[in-house]
Amino acid sequence: MAPPIITAMGLQAIAVALLALLGAAQSGPTPLQRFLARGDEPPVEYRALRRLEANNPKFNQSAWMTAWTEFDRVNGFRFTVAAEGGSGYIRSKVLHAALEGEQKIWANREPDRASFTDDNYTFDAGEQSADGLASVIVKPRRKDVLLGDGSIFVRASDGDLARIEGRLSKTPSFWTRRVDVVRRYQRIAGVRVPVSIESVAHILVAGRSTFKMTYEYETINGQHVGTPQPNASTVLLP
């Protein structure tokens, strides 16, 4: 018969091991594992009113635009300007160009280049953010204007994407030194959709320039979810 103290120590070790296994079982998947398990959701068909704003403090130039934007699998992405104002140069080169660039991306079937997959990124668990979201550090596998180097923030409970913060891994032009981007998401009618994009670009000669775009949804996947209206104070320009 084993000495009582050895038996007690053996039982204690078994108990500790069982508790550790129980704890591991109860802890379940990590936020990173939950996020990766979700995979990319299919493209969302929608109609939304967007407001775009851009500003360059160095030259004291700014502009804004509201536009109806739509996407469906048959007709792709399209937009109609509802109203706009401010610098004609910024409206043309930044605001209109942003929507035209998005239209081109969809027309060329390029969204897969930007998706959060192992083909595009490496993933590492990060720290919990101040707002309670779990962070995931993402590193692009190649330099691409559609890929960011930074962090994504997900709900710890289910891995659902809430925010992206990072720097474009490749700048869109020689004149642009770097672009920092924050993109926020919400679930509306059970569907994850972007609700805002903010960016700060550092440009040779022009210096620091800011861009912001917000979304108000009218329909998502055929379901009416809101009644957005262009600002009544805006004036439609030719």
Please report, for each region that a protein language model flagged, where it lies by residue.
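Structured extracytoplasmic
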Residues: 25-149, 156-162, 169-179, 191, ...
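Bacterial Sec-dependent signal peptides at the C-terminal "C-region" and cleavage site
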Residues: 12, 16-29
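Cys-His-centered catalytic/binding microenvironment captured across papain-like cysteine peptidases
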Residues: 188
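Bacterial N-terminal signal peptides that target proteins for export
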Residues: 2-14
